[in-house]
Curated annotation (Swiss-Prot):
PANTHER family: BETA-DEFENSIN 113. One of its GO terms (cellular component) is extracellular region. Pfam families: Defensin_beta_2. Disulfide bonds join C39-C65, C46-C60, C50-C66. Residues 1-23 form the signal peptide. This is Beta-defensin 18. The keyword Disulfide bond applies. The lineage of its organism: Eukaryota, Metazoa, Chordata, Craniata, Vertebrata. It is found in: Secreted.
Length: 85
């Protein structure tokens, strides 16, 4: 009886340890989202191939992240003076 209980507990420990953690499809989905977000942060776009005036930043799920060569950061506040009348 004790050996059957030991085997049962070992089986339970194995089942619970294998079932914990993210599955492969969840990890793949998270990786795709992270790569797409990194591409978006630098002002890029995930495409099948980049043009001659773009460079490859990182690889997205669908292909390279194409960023314009003359990338300039978007400023939150405009430095141009406002005209008031």
């Amino acid at each position: 009886m004790q050996s059957a209980m030991k085997l049962f507990f070992i089986f339970l420990i194995f089942v619970f340890s294998v079932s914990c953690g993210p599955s492969a499809p969840q990890m793949k989905t998270r990786d795709v989202l992270e790569r797409t977000h990194k591409c978006f942060l630098v002002g890029g776009e995930c495409k099948s191939e980049c043009s001659s005036w773009e460079y490859e930043y990182v690889f997205c799920y669908t292909g390279p992240c194409c960023v314009m060569r003359e990338y300039k950061r978007v400023e939150k506040f405009s430095n141009t003076p406002k005209y008031t009348t």
